[in-house]
Amino acid sequence: MTTLLELKEKLTRFYGKYDIYITPVIKFTVALTAFLLINHNIGYMEKISSTPIALILALICSILPVGGAVFIGSVLILLDMYALSLEVCIVALILFILMYILYFRFSPKNEYGVLLTPICFGLNIPFVMPVGMGLLRELYSMFSLVCGIVLYFFLNGVKQNETTLSGVDEKDAATSKIVVALNQLLGNREMYLVLAIMVVTLVIVY
């Protein structure tokens, strides 16, 4: 535990000293990685799912507050969901509204958590997030971690069920799509287990 506290102090001092140089690079890298992963995994709208567009958007994000990358990423996801299915897009929009309410209410200064958590899951290194946030952020950063986890499992579930969700637009099919999309959140026991483990890990490290 002492070693973790010493590491936390060293990282905080280093970042504070070189903040003006490190921050734009981090913003660009995180945004670009997020946009490329979105394109790779759920790039259903081909017009916006190209590397040049991802690069341009990431450059814009490097001069914006981190919340700008969160907003742009949300728009890209909604457009991709719309290209897949209107019903899924509506469910995603409701999810984002709820997440933004939770995020702005409890953890408005932890935008990186929302972006980096799905990225780390995509790179198969999810436990970097609770450990890193426990070392570098405040305890309330768990809310941005929760938002990131929920977002990852929702998008991963959509990807796994894309054949069903992109079916013909009939009345029964539309209802089925909504049920499938909602089930990625409400019926996902794995997500709830991961949420509990990650939050407990963050609290222990903190």
Label for each model-derived stretch:
Residues 59, 72-148:
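Membrane-interface helix-loop-helix junctions at boundaries between adjacent transmembrane segments
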Residues 22-25, 119, 188-195:
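Hydrophobic alpha-helical transmembrane segments of multi-pass membrane proteins
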Residues 1-18:
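Short, Lys/Arg-rich, polar N-terminal cytosolic tail immediately upstream
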Residues 20-74, 81:
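Hydrophobic transmembrane alpha-helices
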Residues 31, 35, 113, 125-129, ...:
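Alpha-helical transmembrane segments of polytopic integral membrane proteins
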Residues 42-52, 80-94, 187-195:
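Structural signature of hydrophobic alpha-helical transmembrane segments
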Residues 130-206:
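Generic multipass alpha-helical transmembrane bundles of integral membrane proteins
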